[in-house]
Regions:
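Short, Lys/Arg-enriched N-terminal segments with co-localized hydrophobic residues
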Residues: 1-14
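Structured beta-strand/loop patches that form or line metal/cofactor-binding pockets in enzymes
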Residues: 12-50
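Solvent-exposed alpha-helices and their adjacent loops that cap or buttress functional pockets
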Residues: 26-27, 125-127, 153-154
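Ligand-binding pocket scaffold of soluble enzyme catalytic domains
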Residues: 26, 34, 40, 45, ...
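Metal- or metallocofactor-binding catalytic centers and their adjacent structured scaffolds
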Residues: 39-114
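Glycine-rich, aromatic-flanked loop segments that form ligand/cofactor-binding clefts
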Residues: 104-140, 144
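Metal-dependent enolase-superfamily TIM-barrel catalytic cores that perform enediolate-based chemistry
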Residues: 130-185
């Protein structure tokens, strides 16, 4: 199993990060994912998207973070986080933090896989039994789109629709009418 392949006879993790892949998707709405691959074949994936700045975040990961990550123990998550956060020239800036968050997610993904534990347990335990799921209407929303979304959501047992309604006084938008629109529940 993954757990056994990542452990020595003493039960100590001995993996090293061997490869960093930056995956930029979709020409219209870019999402940026980071994939860290260890020498034992275990990999983790994280989301480093920053709307409109994905190429810059990707360059930061490739140029700055990859040399730091290669050869590192992926279970030393806090050590890596502190090194990057304290060592980055623009500490706390959007580019650095998006890149750092994506790598952080990937490292936690690896730790969850090698320990066989769900992330919620590794991060301190379960907080709730359920999570509210919702549907999203892309682009400018009109009454027809809202009605279709309401039907879609109702069929699937969801209770919330996220949409771009516009200002109440704007022509051609749902504006204030959204509050008076179809109820999904």
């Amino acid at each position: 199993t993954l757990q056994r392949s990542a452990q020595t006879a003493q039960g100590v993790l001995t993996m090293k990060i061997e490869q960093v892949k930056v995956i930029l998707t979709s020409p219209n709405q870019n999402y940026l994912f980071v994939k860290l691959i260890t020498d034992s074949g275990v990999y983790g994936v994280g989301d480093a998207s920053l709307n409109g700045q994905e190429h810059t975040v990707a360059d930061f990961i490739t140029s700055f973070l990859t040399p730091i990550l290669i050869g590192r123990d992926p279970t030393q998550i806090e050590d890596f986080w502190q090194l990057v956060y304290r060592g980055a020239y623009w500490r706390g800036g959007n580019i650095v933090m998006s890149a750092l968050c994506g790598v952080d997610m990937a490292l936690w993904d690896i730790l969850g896989k090698v320990t066989g534990q769900p992330l919620y347990r590794l991060l301190g335990g379960k907080v709730r039994d359920k999570v509210l799921c919702y549907s999203h209407v892309l682009g400018k929303t009109n009454e027809e789109k809202a009605a279709l979304a309401a039907s879609y959501v109702k069929e699937r047992g969801l209770k919330v629709i996220r949409l771009r309604a516009g200002a109440p006084a704007a022509n051609g938008t749902l504006g204030g009418g959204v509050q008076d629109g179809p109820k999904v529940e």
